[in-house]
C-alpha cells in the first residue's frame, strides 16, 4: 500500500514515509536502494542514519538471541560471533554520526545496550558521557543495561539506584531486574533488604504460563523457576548451608528433571565440603546432551576441590573459550595461574609466663618463649610437585639463660586427588642434628581422612635438647566430618627421647557450629587429652607419669568489613576445663584469645592475636600471656 501511494509522486515527504515504512518492515536493502534512487541524502540527510540505527537495533537483538542459543547448545565459543560483528560495525560507524543530538543519543543507547550484552561493562559505561544526558534520564532498557554493567564492575551502589528506577516503569520489572537488584544489595552486605526483596519477588513474579491452545496444560513460568533457585541460594549467601542443602534436596525431589536445581544442589554440596557427593549429583546427567554450561562450571570447581589438577586445568581451558566472561571461570583461571608462582607462609608465637613458684617455669618453657615457622614454596612443577624451604626457631628464657633450637630444611611435596606426601631434610643451625621428616595425608571420601607422620628430629623439650638428647616422633590422626559445620578427630603421637623417656599423647575433639549468619559463625568444641611418660618426674622438664585434660571451647568469628576479595574479620575464643596429673588433684584451666584476620587481597592475608591463659602444672598455676602473628601470600 505504501508503495502504491508513493508511485508517481515527487513529494519528498511521501518518499520519506515510504522509506520509514520499509524500515518498519526490516526491508533495509530496499530502503537503502530507494534512498539512493531518489537521492534523498540531499533533502533528508538524516534518513540513512535512521535506517542504520534501526538495522543496528535488529542485528543486536538477533546477536543476543544467537548467543543464548549457542550457550544452550553448548557452543559457547560461537556465542558472540554475530554480536561482535555488529559491535565492530558500530564502532566504525561512530565517526559518521550526524550532528543531530537525538540521533547521536539513539546510537549510543543502542551501543551501550550491545556492549553490556557482550559483557563489556567498562566500555558500556564509558559511552555515558557521549550521550549528553545522565543515566537516570535514559530509556528504560539503557538504564537496565547500565545497571548490569555497574554490577559487573563491582559498583553495586550505582547499580542499585538504576535497578530501583526500573520499577517505576509499568510492567517492565521481570526476574532479571529483581535478580540484578538482589545481587546489588547482597554485594553491599544489605542482607535484610535482600530478604525483603525475595518476599516481594514471591508476590510479584508470575507462577505459571498459560497456553491458548486447547488441551495444553499450564507450565511453570521461567521467572518462577529462576526465583525458586535464587531462594535456595539466598540461604548460602547467609551462610545457612544446612538450610540450603535441605531446600534443594526437597526441590530436586519434586522436580528431578530440572538440571538447574540439580546444579544448585551440587554447588551447595561443594560449599558444604562434600565435593565427591557434588560430582555424583552432576554425573547423573552424563548421558544428557548438550551438557548444561552451569553444570560444566560446577564440575570444573569440583575438580579443583578434589585436587584433580589435570582435569581442573583441562576444564578451565575449555570453559575459557566457551564461557570466558563467567566470574567462576575467571576465578578458576586465576587460581591455576597462582600455582605458577612462589608462595610463603609464616607464623610466630611470643609468650611470657608467670607463676608463684619460679622453679616451675624452669620445668616448662621458661619465663619467656618464642616459636616461629616460615615456609617458602616454589611454583608447582608438573601440576603435582613443588619444592619448599623451611625455617623453624624456638627458644625459651630460663634462669641459666636462653636455650635455642633453630633448624633449616629443604623438602619436596606431592599432592594429587586429595592425597599429599612430603619429605624434608633438615639441619640444626648450631649443631649436627640432621633430620628427616615424612608426612602423608589422604581423604578417603568426603567424610573421612587420616594422616601419618615421622620426624627423626622431633621438637623435644628444650631442657632435654640442652643436655644433648634427641628424639624421634611418630604421629597418626583420624578425622571425620559430616560437613563444614560438624567435625571430629583423634590423634596419637609417640615421642621417643634418648634420655629414656617415651612420651605418648592421645587427643580428641568434637566441633559443632551453633549459629550462622551473613557476617558471623559461632561454634562450640569439646577437647580432651591424655599423656603418659615412661621417665616420669625424673626428667629435667615437666613430665608427669600420667595426665588428663578436658575443656569446652566457644568460638565466634565476625566478618566486620568485606569488599569482594578483601575483608577484615575478628575471632574470639574462650576455653575452660580441667587438668589432672598423677599425684595432684584436678585444677581448672582457662584460656581467652582474640585475633584479627585481614584478607588484604585475593592472594595475601595477615593475622595477629593476643591471648591469656591459666594452666596448672605440679599443682601450681602458670599464667601465660601470648601473642600470635602470621601471614601468607603469593609472589
Where are each of the predicted segments found?
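Gram-negative and organellar
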Residues: 1-4, 8-635
Amino acid at each position: 500500500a505504501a508503495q502504491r501511494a508513493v508511485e508517481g509522486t515527487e513529494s519528498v515527504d511521501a518518499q520519506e514515509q515510504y522509506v520509514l515504512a520499509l524500515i518498519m518492515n526490516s526491508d533495509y536493502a530496499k530502503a537503502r536502494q530507494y534512498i539512493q534512487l531518489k537521492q534523498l541524502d540531499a533533502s533528508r540527510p538524516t534518513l540513512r542514519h535512521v535506517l542504520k540505527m534501526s538495522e543496528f537495533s535488529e542485528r543486536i537483538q538477533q546477536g543476543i538471541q544467537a548467543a543464548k542459543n549457542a550457550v544452550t547448545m553448548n557452543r559457547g565459543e560461537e556465542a558472540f560471533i554475530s554480536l561482535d560483528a555488529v559491535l565492530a560495525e558500530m564502532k566504525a560507524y561512530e565517526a559518521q554520526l550526524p550532528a543531530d543530538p537525538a540521533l547521536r543519543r539513539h546510537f549510543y543507547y543502542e551501543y551501550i545496550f550491545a556492549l553490556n550484552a557482550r559483557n563489556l561493562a567498562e566500555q558500556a559505561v564509558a559511552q555515558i558521557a557521549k550521550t549528553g544526558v545522565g543515566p537516570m534520564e535514559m530509556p528504560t532498557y539503557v538504564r537496565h543495561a547500565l545497571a548490569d554493567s555497574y554490577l559487573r564492575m563491582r559498583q553495586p551502589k550505582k547499580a542499585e539506584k538504576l535497578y530501583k528506577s526500573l520499577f517505576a516503569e509499568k510492567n517492565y520489572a521481570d526476574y532479571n531486574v529483581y535478580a540484578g537488584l538482589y545481587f546489588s544489595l547482597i554485594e553491599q552486605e544489605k542482607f535484610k533488604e535482600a530478604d525483603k526483596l525475595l518476599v516481594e519477588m514471591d508476590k510479584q513474579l508470575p507462577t505459571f504460563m498459560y497456553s491458548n491452545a486447547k488441551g495444553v496444560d499450564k507450565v511453570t513460568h521461567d521467572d518462577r523457576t529462576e526465583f525458586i533457585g535464587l531462594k535456595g541460594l539466598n540461604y548460602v549467601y547467609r551462610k545457612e548451608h544446612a538450610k540450603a542443602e535441605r531446600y534443594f534436596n526437597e526441590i530436586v525431589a519434586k522436580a528431578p528433571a530440572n538440571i538447574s536445581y540439580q546444579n544448585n544442589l551440587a554447588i551447595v554440596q561443594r560449599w558444604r565440603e562434600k565435593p565427591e557427593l557434588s560430582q555424583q549429583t552432576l554425573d547423573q546427567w552424563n548421558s544428557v546432551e548438550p551438557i548444561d554450561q552451569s553444570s560444566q562450571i560446577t564440575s570444573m570447581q569440583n575438580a579443583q576441590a578434589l585436587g584433580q589438577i589435570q582435569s581442573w586445568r583441562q576444564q578451565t581451558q575449555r570453559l575459557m573459550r566457551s564461557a570466558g566472561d563467567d566470574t567462576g571461570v575467571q576465578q578458576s583461571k586465576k587460581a591455576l595461574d597462582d600455582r605458577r608462582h612462589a608462595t610463603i607462609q609464616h607464623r610466630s608465637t611470643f609468650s611470657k609466663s608467670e607463676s608463684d613458684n619460679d622453679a616451675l617455669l624452669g620445668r616448662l618453657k621458661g619465663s619467656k618463649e618464642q616459636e616461629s615457622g616460615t615456609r617458602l614454596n616454589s611454583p608447582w612443577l608438573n601440576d603435582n610437585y613443588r619444592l619448599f624451604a623451611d625455617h623453624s626457631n624456638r627458644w625459651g628464657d630460663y634462669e641459666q639463660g636462653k636455650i635455642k633450637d633453630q633448624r633449616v630444611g629443604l623438602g619436596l611435596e606431592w599432592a594429587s586427588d586429595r592425597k599429599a606426601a612430603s619429605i624434608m631434610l633438615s639441619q640444626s643451625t648450631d649443631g649436627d642434628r640432621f633430620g628427616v621428616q615424612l608426612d602423608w595425608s589422604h581423604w578417603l571420601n568426603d567424610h573421612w581422612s587420616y594422616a601419618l607422620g615421622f620426624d627423626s628430629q622431633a621438637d623435644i623439650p628444650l631442657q632435654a635438647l640442652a643436655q644433648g638428647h634427641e628424639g624421634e616422633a611418630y604421629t597418626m590422626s583420624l578425622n571425620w566430618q559430616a560437613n563444614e559445620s560438624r567435625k571430629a578427630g583423634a590423634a596419637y603421637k609417640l615421642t621417643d627421647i634418648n634420655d629414656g623417656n617415651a612420651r605418648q599423647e592421645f587427643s580428641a575433639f568434637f566441633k559443632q557450629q551453633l549459629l550462622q549468619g551473613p557476617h558471623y559463625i559461632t561454634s562450640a568444641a569439646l577437647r580432651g587429652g591424655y599423656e603418659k611418660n615412661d621417665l616420669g618426674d625424673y626428667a629435667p622438664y615437666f613430665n608427669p607419669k600420667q595426665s588428663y585434660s578436658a575443656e569446652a571451647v566457644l568460638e565466634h568469628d565476625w566478618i566486620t568489613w568485606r569488599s569482594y576479595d578483601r575483608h577484615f574479620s575478628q575471632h574470639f575464643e574462650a576455653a575452660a576445663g580441667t587438668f589432672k596429673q598423677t599425684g595432684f588433684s584436678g585444677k581448672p584451666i582457662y584460656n581467652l584469645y582474640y585475633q584479627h584476620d585481614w584478607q588484604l587481597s585475593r592472594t595475601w592475608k595477615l593475622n595477629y592475636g593476643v591471648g591469656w591463659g591459666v594452666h596448672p602444672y605440679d599443682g601450681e598455676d602458670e599464667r601465660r600471656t601470648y601473642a600470635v602473628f602470621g601471614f601468607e601470600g603469593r609472589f
